[in-house]
């Protein structure tokens, strides 16, 4: 069997979005499960719009998702001489020709065709004319066959046939000599010995044109697979409002790479009713021919559900660095407090993203500067001062700071003052966190630590006294 070689070829004119990442994932999985090579190519011939920042974001996004590549990144901007060489080869073999048609003529041609309800296309005016000796500007067009059809077996859509009469003579070199997309991608796939081109279905109209150029070059054809687009929850093309944002924005919003990878593989592909896939299972089970031909709908709630699953199941040690980044972005000082791993283990059941977890965990690391007004009004009352003082004294005298002993102090104090457990736990919670929501109060006290907990109880008691005064 031929050595499988797939590629991902993004254009660095913007961010790496969800659709592009899913295409990269499918291509990467196909290579990995066939012990093949995954090639990364940067299509940066659009000099005006390509930026180094976009290149950096693409590489960073792929690395974050651990979509690794065997070769590259190759840059089209560094291969211009090769493209010019192939263009000259096509002209010499009479598979391409100079076109001197002016912009005005082409506009007039298009308007006439539209007026006559015809499909706009180049009419071949210069196709059989001899090259001029003047210095007039010209483009170079590929001489597309006028007979027969282009037939190929799409890995996802099955057999596709396009009549060559539907295709006009596309431009392969602009008037400044610069190669066009359909030329560069053909040369790259040929030179890099790509065996399987897996890409978005927005490229499907380019495929028959590229196949004809490959035929003219005497090149072996790769297999093609066109992945349907991703729609928003409203059934329309995915917008920024519904998730069409940079993959790095998901990282910055506190999603885990495992969750996003798992979510993307299920966008348009299924393996029975299985929802959770490890990376090993993805490589083992993914089947490109089983990808749906219909567009997939992006579901933000499903992604959140998966993210929480991985927050609960991935080792806290693996998540700790990303969690620290979220805490620091929220302005939390991490010099004091419990280990990040302890907080992650405690909060994973209660939060869906690392960003949310960080927002709800600041009180483990720094003093509470203020209380939620509604929470203080309801729970920090004069009647609770004595029970709080009792809890404070008992906690201070514990021989060791253990969660079970802390729990006993709260239960016994509640019984002594004839309070329900919640009637005592909530004021303690407000004193410790400034609000009414936290993990179990004994676990919260344990992680905050004895010294800080006693300070916060003292502060709450003073706050109540000031309100009484």
Swiss-Prot record:
Amino acids binding Zn(2+): 99, 101, 126, 128
Localisation per UniProt entry: Cytoplasm
Any single GO BP term: glutamyl-tRNA aminoacylation
Binding-site list for ATP: 240
Top enzyme class: ligase
Enzyme Commission identifier(s): 6.1.1.17
Cofactor comment text: Binds 1 zinc ion per subunit.
UniProt motif 'KMSKS' region: location: 237-241
Main location: cytoplasm
Domain of life of the source: Bacteria
Pfam entry (one): Anticodon_2
Sorted UniProt keywords: Aminoacyl-tRNA synthetase, ATP-binding, Cytoplasm, Ligase, Metal-binding, Nucleotide-binding, Protein biosynthesis, Zinc
Cofactor requirement: Zn(2+)
GO cellular component, one term: cytosol
GO MF annotation, one: zinc ion binding
Catalytic function, reaction form: tRNA(Glu) + L-glutamate + ATP = L-glutamyl-tRNA(Glu) + AMP + diphosphate
NCBIfam families: gltX_bact (TIGR00464)
Protein task: Catalyzes the attachment of glutamate to tRNA(Glu) in a two-step reaction: glutamate is first activated by ATP to form Glu-AMP and then transferred to the acceptor end of tRNA(Glu).
Official protein name in the record: Glutamate--tRNA ligase 1
UniProt source species: Coxiella burnetii (strain CbuK_Q154) (Coxiella burnetii (strain Q154))
